[in-house]
Amino acid sequence: MMKDNKIHCCLCGKEIDERESNNASPFKGRCCNECNVKKVIPTRYALSRKYALLFKAPTTYSEGGIDCITHPERLSLHDLQEKVDGYIEIIDLHNDYVLIINEEGRLYDLPTNVVWSKMEMSDLCVPLVGNVILMRKEQLK
Protein backbone atom coordinates (compact mmCIF):
# COMPACT_ATOMS: atom_id res chain seq x y z
CA MET A 1 0.00 0.00 0.00
CA MET A 2 1.34 3.43 -0.98
CA LYS A 3 1.83 6.05 1.67
CA ASP A 4 -0.18 9.24 1.27
CA ASN A 5 2.40 12.00 0.70
CA LYS A 6 0.87 15.41 1.20
CA ILE A 7 2.83 18.51 0.25
CA HIS A 8 1.94 22.18 -0.19
CA CYS A 9 1.80 23.94 -3.55
CA CYS A 10 4.84 26.21 -3.81
CA LEU A 11 2.72 29.00 -5.30
CA CYS A 12 -0.59 29.05 -3.43
CA GLY A 13 0.16 26.91 -0.37
CA LYS A 14 -2.77 24.54 -0.92
CA GLU A 15 -2.25 20.98 0.37
CA ILE A 16 -1.93 18.50 -2.51
CA ASP A 17 -1.01 14.86 -3.04
CA GLU A 18 2.63 14.72 -4.15
CA ARG A 19 1.81 12.13 -6.84
CA GLU A 20 -0.61 14.60 -8.44
CA SER A 21 1.69 17.62 -8.22
CA ASN A 22 3.45 19.30 -11.13
CA ASN A 23 7.01 20.42 -11.78
CA ALA A 24 6.71 24.16 -11.22
CA SER A 25 9.88 25.20 -13.07
CA PRO A 26 10.77 28.09 -13.53
CA PHE A 27 9.35 28.41 -10.00
CA LYS A 28 10.89 26.55 -7.06
CA GLY A 29 9.20 23.33 -5.95
CA ARG A 30 6.00 21.50 -6.91
CA CYS A 31 2.61 23.04 -7.64
CA CYS A 32 -1.08 22.18 -7.80
CA ASN A 33 -2.94 21.77 -11.10
CA GLU A 34 -4.60 25.18 -10.82
CA CYS A 35 -1.29 27.05 -10.37
CA ASN A 36 0.26 24.96 -13.13
CA VAL A 37 -2.42 26.16 -15.55
CA LYS A 38 -2.67 29.78 -14.32
CA LYS A 39 0.98 30.59 -13.53
CA VAL A 40 3.55 27.98 -14.57
CA ILE A 41 2.50 27.24 -18.14
CA PRO A 42 1.94 30.92 -19.08
CA THR A 43 5.34 31.82 -17.59
CA ARG A 44 7.10 29.07 -19.53
CA TYR A 45 5.33 30.11 -22.72
CA ALA A 46 6.22 33.78 -22.28
CA LEU A 47 9.87 33.02 -21.60
CA SER A 48 10.08 30.73 -24.63
CA ARG A 49 8.55 33.43 -26.85
CA LYS A 50 10.95 36.10 -25.60
CA TYR A 51 8.15 38.07 -23.99
CA ALA A 52 8.73 40.06 -20.84
CA LEU A 53 6.89 39.21 -17.65
CA LEU A 54 5.38 41.58 -15.11
CA PHE A 55 5.25 40.01 -11.64
CA LYS A 56 2.63 42.05 -9.80
CA ALA A 57 3.05 42.55 -6.08
CA PRO A 58 0.11 41.78 -3.82
CA THR A 59 -2.22 44.61 -2.89
CA THR A 60 -5.13 44.98 -0.51
CA TYR A 61 -7.40 43.80 -3.32
CA SER A 62 -5.35 41.06 -5.05
CA GLU A 63 -2.78 38.39 -4.27
CA GLY A 64 -0.51 39.53 -7.09
CA GLY A 65 0.05 37.66 -10.31
CA ILE A 66 1.83 37.51 -13.61
CA ASP A 67 1.13 39.47 -16.79
CA CYS A 68 2.77 38.88 -20.14
CA ILE A 69 4.26 41.85 -22.03
CA THR A 70 4.21 40.76 -25.67
CA HIS A 71 6.34 43.53 -27.20
CA PRO A 72 8.82 44.59 -24.51
CA GLU A 73 11.12 46.22 -27.06
CA ARG A 74 8.41 48.87 -27.58
CA LEU A 75 8.36 49.94 -23.94
CA SER A 76 9.57 53.47 -23.32
CA LEU A 77 11.09 54.69 -20.07
CA HIS A 78 7.69 56.16 -19.19
CA ASP A 79 5.99 52.78 -19.84
CA LEU A 80 8.46 50.98 -17.57
CA GLN A 81 7.99 53.59 -14.83
CA GLU A 82 4.21 53.15 -15.08
CA LYS A 83 4.48 49.38 -14.71
CA VAL A 84 6.67 49.57 -11.58
CA ASP A 85 4.89 52.64 -10.17
CA GLY A 86 7.95 54.89 -9.96
CA TYR A 87 11.54 55.45 -10.98
CA ILE A 88 13.17 52.33 -12.38
CA GLU A 89 16.19 50.42 -11.20
CA ILE A 90 17.75 47.78 -13.45
CA ILE A 91 19.21 44.64 -11.88
CA ASP A 92 21.49 42.53 -14.07
CA LEU A 93 20.92 38.83 -13.36
CA HIS A 94 24.22 37.98 -15.09
CA ASN A 95 22.53 35.74 -17.62
CA ASP A 96 20.36 36.84 -20.54
CA TYR A 97 17.89 38.63 -18.26
CA VAL A 98 17.49 41.85 -16.31
CA LEU A 99 14.94 42.88 -13.72
CA ILE A 100 13.29 46.25 -13.61
CA ILE A 101 11.98 47.34 -10.23
CA ASN A 102 10.86 50.50 -8.45
CA GLU A 103 14.06 52.18 -7.29
CA GLU A 104 12.31 53.64 -4.24
CA GLY A 105 10.15 50.62 -3.42
CA ARG A 106 11.65 50.09 0.03
CA LEU A 107 11.33 53.79 0.89
CA TYR A 108 7.62 53.62 0.06
CA ASP A 109 7.27 50.33 1.99
CA LEU A 110 5.91 48.47 -1.03
CA PRO A 111 4.87 44.86 -0.35
CA THR A 112 7.26 41.98 -0.99
CA ASN A 113 6.70 40.46 -4.40
CA VAL A 114 5.89 36.92 -3.31
CA VAL A 115 5.27 35.64 -6.84
CA TRP A 116 8.74 36.71 -8.02
CA SER A 117 10.35 35.33 -4.86
CA LYS A 118 9.22 31.84 -5.91
CA MET A 119 11.10 31.95 -9.22
CA GLU A 120 14.22 29.78 -9.54
CA MET A 121 16.29 32.78 -10.61
CA SER A 122 15.21 34.89 -7.62
CA ASP A 123 18.21 34.10 -5.42
CA LEU A 124 19.10 37.72 -4.67
CA CYS A 125 20.36 38.95 -1.31
CA VAL A 126 17.15 40.79 -0.43
CA PRO A 127 13.53 40.11 -1.39
CA LEU A 128 12.21 42.45 -4.06
CA VAL A 129 9.26 44.72 -3.35
CA GLY A 130 6.61 46.13 -5.63
CA ASN A 131 6.09 45.11 -9.23
CA VAL A 132 8.98 43.35 -10.98
CA ILE A 133 9.58 43.15 -14.74
CA LEU A 134 11.71 40.30 -16.07
CA MET A 135 12.99 40.83 -19.60
CA ARG A 136 15.89 39.91 -21.84
CA LYS A 137 18.81 42.35 -21.90
CA GLU A 138 18.52 42.78 -25.67
CA GLN A 139 14.94 44.07 -25.26
CA LEU A 140 16.02 46.96 -23.07
CA LYS A 141 16.53 50.18 -25.02
List each model region and its residues.
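Short metal-binding segments enriched for Cys and/or His
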Residues: 36-48
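Short, cysteine/histidine-rich loop/knuckle motifs that typically chelate Zn2+
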Residues: 10-13, 34
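Detector for the mature cores of small, proteolytically processed
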Residues: 49-141
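Surface loops and adjacent helix of pleckstrin homology
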Residues: 21, 44-45, 93
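Short linker/helix segments within small regulatory modules
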Residues: 19-29
